């Protein structure tokens, strides 16, 4: 970086800070499903009420990320994440004191969702991608995604322990305090746009968006990422309650989320390495098809604790392994200059899927008393996503032919 104010921010420091931001930012929000039963029981709300709030949160995350990405691409991720951390903490605090559904929609949905968008690990990953060469970029993106999964491993049992020891309200207050740690970590990221040479340097934001939206592969990638959001958000929010519904104790649900995160550390990192050696779009097709197969097996086989843990482990390998590959395709085809913005657009589709996965999960459960319809929908969407990714053209644009990812 040519900016002397950023000289002390070495690539290693930026990568470490980015990974820690992913651990806390993603880890904290991945545990909200653990609060479904205690919070709705205390407030007398239905699962649909809770689900709609978290669906709004996912939607705000999706709507906010392109904006956060555009600001980060222009001014750097540091200030964006700092502001987001404050919103995030205020929102989680508000979840603990909201006594009406409308206030819960505001705090858990709008405020927390916006905070999550402005602290998203993809912002940190974009900063990480800019401080390494193209030959290491896919691996670094895998490392950042794996760090987010480590957050899920840490926060799932931690949050369940907070709930068991202090009650759900105090547990949320503790999580709000932990989120504030993002503020000093954000200060370790570059505070202004990196000035490294890039074939995109003369391109405007509007030009980048127009170019991407007219690219068939970008549109297909965006469509496919909808399915990832549908799967991940539904399981994150509703799986702990599903586990209790089939007669297993609550700790099985908490540990299942932790196992998903644990195995996703390996899955995300390995997918990043695979993205350097194999076709990224073909790897994505395999991942989505494998998800459909695993969910089908879970539905048809007996629901014992051991089997649920096995399902969680396999699903964990497939969990966010889509992220380094999806991000990698965007960087490979369009370059890194507007990576945060362009991935934000793709991620909006992911979050629309998340909104539907979370909200429909609660709505269909309240209507039918079962999650089976949502699981089968997940199988169908997994097959569709596998088909959608196959024809993507992942070759760099003509102006980027000298760059490799």
Report residues per predicted region.
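C-terminal ends and interior cores of transmembrane alpha-helices
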Residues: 86-99, 290-303
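Central cavity-lining transmembrane alpha-helices of secondary-active solute carriers
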Residues: 55-70, 258-270
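Cytoplasmic helix-loop-helix junction between adjacent transmembrane helices
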Residues: 108-146, 335
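Hydrophobic core of transmembrane alpha-helices in multi-pass small-molecule transporters
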Residues: 103-119, 226, 307-321
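Helix-loop-helix hairpin linking two adjacent transmembrane segments in secondary transporters
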Residues: 144-194
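Flexible cytoplasmic inter-helical loops of multi-pass small-molecule transporters
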Residues: 188-207, 398-405
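Helix-to-loop junctions at the C-terminal end of transmembrane segments
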Residues: 64-76, 268-279, 366
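Extracytoplasmic gate region of multi-pass secondary transporters
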Residues: 32-36, 216-269
């Amino acid at each position: 970086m040519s900016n002397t104010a950023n000289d002390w921010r070495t690539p290693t420091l930026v990568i470490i800070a980015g990974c820690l931001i992913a651990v806390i930012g993603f880890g904290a929000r991945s545990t909200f499903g653990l609060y479904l039963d205690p919070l709705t029981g205390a407030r007398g709300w239905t699962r649909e009420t809770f689900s709609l709030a978290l669906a709004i949160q996912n939607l705000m995350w999706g709507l906010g990320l392109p904006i956060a990405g555009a600001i980060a691409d222009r001014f750097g991720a540091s200030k964006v994440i700092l502001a987001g951390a404050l919103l995030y903490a205020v929102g989680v605090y508000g979840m603990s004191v909201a006594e009406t559904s409308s206030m819960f929609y505001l705090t858990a949905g709008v405020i927390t969702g916006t905070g999550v968008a402005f602290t998203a690990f993809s912002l940190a990953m974009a900063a990480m991608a800019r401080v390494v060469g193209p030959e290491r970029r896919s691996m670094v993106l895998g490392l950042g995604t794996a760090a987010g999964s480590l957050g899920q491993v840490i926060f799932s049992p931690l949050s369940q322990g907070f709930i068991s020891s202090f009650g759900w309200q105090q547990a949320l207050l503790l999580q709000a305090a932990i989120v504030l740690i993002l503020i000093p970590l954000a200060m370790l990221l570059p505070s202004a746009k990196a000035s490294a040479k890039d074939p995109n340097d003369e391109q405007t934001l509007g030009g980048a968006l127009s170019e991407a939206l007219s690219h068939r592969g970008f549109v297909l990638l965006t469509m496919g990422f909808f399915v990832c959001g549908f799967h991940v958000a539904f399981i994150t929010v509703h799986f702990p309650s599903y586990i209790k519904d089939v007669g297993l104790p609550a700790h099985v649900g908490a540990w299942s989320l932790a196992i998903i995160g644990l195995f996703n550390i390996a899955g995300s990192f390995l997918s990043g390495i695979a993205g350097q050696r194999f076709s990224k779009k073909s790897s994505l097709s395999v991942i989505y098809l494998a998800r459909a197969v695993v969910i089908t097996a879970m539905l048809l086989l007996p629901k014992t604790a051991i089997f649920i843990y096995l399902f969680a482990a396999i699903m964990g390998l497939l969990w966010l392994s889509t992220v380094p590959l999806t991000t990698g395709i965007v960087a490979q085809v369009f370059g890194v200059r507007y990576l945060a913005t362009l991935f934000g657009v793709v991620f909006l589709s992911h979050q629309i899927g998340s909104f539907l996965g979370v909200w429909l999960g609660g709505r269909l459960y309240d209507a039918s008393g079962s999650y089976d319809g949502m699981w089968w929908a997940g199988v169908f969407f997994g097959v569709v996503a596998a088909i959608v990714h196959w024809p993507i053209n992942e070759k760099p644009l003509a102006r980027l032919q000298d760059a490799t990812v």
